[in-house]
Amino acid sequence: MTNTDSKELIAFYNVENLFLPDSPPVHKLDPTVSGLRNWDEKRYSNKLFKISHVFQLIKESENALPMLIGLSEIQGQKPLDELVKMDPFNSNYGVIHYDSMDERGVDVALLYDKSKIEVISSEPITYFFEIDDEDPANYDTTRDILFCKVKYSGEMINLFVVHLPSKRERDVNKPKRDHILKDIKEKVLKL
């Protein structure tokens, strides 16, 4: 995005499983909450450091941080709150996040520079897919799409933070991706 005074950066980063550390298992073969092996406080802290370092490199390269940052594969609010306290964000960034109904607990989020961005509204867009089971615990869901309206220098910006279902298992999720993309297109055309 460019205005007459300066160039602003917008970024998207799939942080690949930014989950809170697991409690130590009783037995080494016990399943973990995150689903990751040996996901402890040390590895979690290292992951946060590496993510913040990526943005430090962007700052050094571009002489500025992105004013808007879409993130995917986050589990919950706490990792985001911890990330924005670190260098180079230094608590100057706000967080927009909603817990999704994704079976792995994977969410998307938006970080924004509080000195440049005014949040007007935000909402998760949740998708349910048909299954032959009426028990809500068995619904086929995926991560939410995050829709935000923000204001920058008097201009309204509409954003969708999207992390589509993966292309795994012979692309079983293609109909889901197609449905979500069609829905987003319809929403964009109505803006």
What are these regions (language model features)?
Residues M1-M86, N90-N92, I96-D102, V106:
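N-terminal, active-site-proximal structural segment of metallo-dependent hydrolase catalytic domains
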Residues T2-I10, D22, K116-I117, D140-V162, ...:
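Beta-strand-turn-beta hairpins that frame and shape the catalytic cleft
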Residues L20, F128-I131, K167-E169:
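A short local loop/turn or secondary-structure capping micro-motif enriched for an aromatic residue
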Residues S23-P24, S122, E169:
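Short capping/connector residues at structural and topological boundaries
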Residues R43-I51, D140, K176-D183:
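Soluble or luminal CAZymes and related metallo-dependent hydrolases
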Residues S52-K59, K149, K185-L189:
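Generic structural signal for well-ordered alpha-helical scaffold segments
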Residues G70, I74-M156:
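Structured beta-strand-rich core segments of catalytic domains in phosphoester-bond hydrolases
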Residues Y152-L191:
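Extracytoplasmic, non-cytosolic globular domains
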